[in-house]
Amino acid sequence: MDNYRRLHTPVALCVASPPAPPTTSWKSMEGLVQCSANHVPLSPITFLERSSKAYRDNTSLVYGSVRYTWAQTHHRCLKLASALTTHLGISPGDVVATFSYNLPEIYELHFAVPMAGGILCTLNARNDSAMVSTLLAHSEAKLIFVEPQLLETARAALDLLAQKDIKPPTLVLLTDSESFTSSSYDHYNHLLANGSDDFEIRRPKNEWDPISINYTSGTTARPKAVVYSHRGAYLNSIATVLLHGMGTTSVYLWSVPMFHCNGWCFPWGAAAQGATNICIRKVSPKAIFDNIHLHKVTHFGAAPTVLNMIVNSPEGNLHTPLPHKVEVMTGGSPPPPKVIARMEEMGFQVNHIYGLTETCGPAANCVCKPEWDALQPEERYALKARQGLNHLAMEEMDVRDPVTMESVRADGATIGEVMFRGNTVMSGYFKDLKATEEAFEGGWFRSGDLGVKHEDGYIQLKDRKKDVVISGGENISTVEVETVLYSHEAVLEAAVVARPDKLWGETPCAFVTLKEGFDNDVSADQIIKFCRDRLPHYMAPKTVVFEELPKTSTGKIQKYILKEKAMAMGSLS
């Protein structure tokens, strides 16, 4: 059984009542039919063909001195899709992996691979050779596109596969440089030269066909293979650009890795609206400010840790106020209100979004209300830090009791699990039926996030299930403790985890990175007192460790590493 068929193995997952079949609802409506005239499988690859005509000469993509129009991007993707099928033998359902940062070629592969009928699998560019080898074996990738700077890691990964008698994928280099003349590898530009722009796109026969596989970020140390459908990617792409007001004149800076949730589906969304893409390989405050001024960037996305870097960077003082409106979409963890406040003081418009790899990225956003402008800053930014309402393409989002599946009271206090139901939820975990069934138990996707629902219907996260500290029988939200820590003038970054305790079971342990210049001015006792003055005493950290925090490639703090460190400390009592 090939990959495509295996991905489509039917699974009985949801115990909720299924919708009635069309024949039942149409009994009294004679003359209605579903046919190719009124039902075409949804796929985001259709956006590119339209943009090549509607925005033909508009700039589609910029990377340093490289610049393409939408007509050129469409032409290149057709030729690449042709070469994938005729030169490299890609068949429908074959997996094509990438191992690279945000280069123009990765953007093009988001179209070319599904145009050839393949399934795109973008691997985290920070993975080591052992992880790359594991993911290539699991996904059964037939090809892997690699940028030159990561070639040695990729080679080592392929060697590991060969040692296990697993056929490694064909490696294609993302370069036309003369310094890489080895005949051992195909080159991206050679493929383009051998492709034909007369290629007939392999459109999905079913909109539920897989378009991509995304491995979860690794904050749990065990990545899972999340499968996106053409339908889900199509709907999420359109919803995201509409919610954030992106149009033909918008300029999107690629600060979110395309290997993370397919870049929140923005490769396809930008094409839908004919927006301009600015690619950068490495993210830094300087790169962000430079591109805002050079290319008049209007939108970019970033984790709260990246926003924290921006507000604490010297570039922030040099380049603000901004010359024009720039919207920042932030997600990945609850943003500290203080960071949102500082970003907006600098001239950024912060839009808080929330989602998971399993929801194609964005699944909710905090819609700001005009009446919030009249509130005191502290209250206003606290409201903006909430996760908000369901995304435009997500039919339902709720906080429910995970046992009874009843919706919790909208009182801002009753904690339940955040759950989703909609067309942008993943198809499932590839090769992990048990995990898929657990995630969909009860007819909803269970996020694993704990939250509350306020009177206005807005949802607010309190913690991940696995991150809650249980001390003396009391549940402590690490998010609430971290919010207080971020309000300290000397704290650059903070994360709270559980430390084992013989008397209390667990106690809060805070890992803190101090701002430059404060290293010798702040002690652990001072941090603890600061928290005790602002929180119930049982919630205040009992341990404070000063060090740099480990992060994923998207800037999310890897709490599992900190938990291991706290566990190794042993009991405080």
Swiss-Prot record:
<comment type="function">
    <text>Involved in the biosynthesis of prenylated phenolics natural products which contribute to the bitter taste of beer and display broad biological activities. Catalyzes the ligation of CoA on isovalerate to produce 3-methylbutanoyl-CoA. Can also use butanoate, hexanoate, pentanoate, 3-methylpentanoate and 4-methylpentanoate as substrates with a lower efficiency.</text>
</comment>
<keyword id="KW-0963">Cytoplasm</keyword>
<dbReference type="Pfam" id="PF13193">
    <property type="entry name" value="AMP-binding_C"/>
</dbReference>
<keyword id="KW-0067">ATP-binding</keyword>
<comment type="pathway">
    <text>Secondary metabolite biosynthesis.</text>
</comment>
<keyword id="KW-0436">Ligase</keyword>
<feature type="binding site">
    <location>
        <begin position="461"/>
        <end position="464"/>
    </location>
    <ligand>
        <name>ATP</name>
    </ligand>
</feature>
<feature type="binding site">
    <location>
        <position position="556"/>
    </location>
    <ligand>
        <name>ATP</name>
    </ligand>
</feature>
<dbReference type="Pfam" id="PF00501">
    <property type="entry name" value="AMP-binding"/>
</dbReference>
<comment type="similarity">
    <text>Belongs to the ATP-dependent AMP-binding enzyme family.</text>
</comment>
<dbReference type="InterPro" id="IPR025110">
    <property type="entry name" value="AMP-bd_C"/>
</dbReference>
<dbReference type="GO" id="GO:0005829">
    <property type="term" value="C:cytosol"/>
</dbReference>
<dbReference type="InterPro" id="IPR000873">
    <property type="entry name" value="AMP-dep_synth/lig_dom"/>
</dbReference>
<keyword id="KW-0547">Nucleotide-binding</keyword>
<feature type="region of interest" description="SBD2">
    <location>
        <begin position="353"/>
        <end position="429"/>
    </location>
</feature>
<protein>
    <recommendedName>
        <fullName>Isovalerate--CoA ligase CCL2</fullName>
        <ecNumber>6.2.1.-</ecNumber>
    </recommendedName>
</protein>
<feature type="binding site">
    <location>
        <begin position="352"/>
        <end position="357"/>
    </location>
    <ligand>
        <name>ATP</name>
    </ligand>
</feature>
<dbReference type="GO" id="GO:0016405">
    <property type="term" value="F:CoA-ligase activity"/>
</dbReference>
<dbReference type="InterPro" id="IPR042099">
    <property type="entry name" value="ANL_N_sf"/>
</dbReference>
<dbReference type="InterPro" id="IPR045851">
    <property type="entry name" value="AMP-bd_C_sf"/>
</dbReference>
<feature type="binding site">
    <location>
        <begin position="216"/>
        <end position="224"/>
    </location>
    <ligand>
        <name>ATP</name>
    </ligand>
</feature>
<dbReference type="GO" id="GO:0031956">
    <property type="term" value="F:medium-chain fatty acid-CoA ligase activity"/>
</dbReference>
<dbReference type="GO" id="GO:0005524">
    <property type="term" value="F:ATP binding"/>
</dbReference>
<feature type="region of interest" description="SBD1">
    <location>
        <begin position="284"/>
        <end position="352"/>
    </location>
</feature>
<feature type="binding site">
    <location>
        <position position="449"/>
    </location>
    <ligand>
        <name>ATP</name>
    </ligand>
</feature>
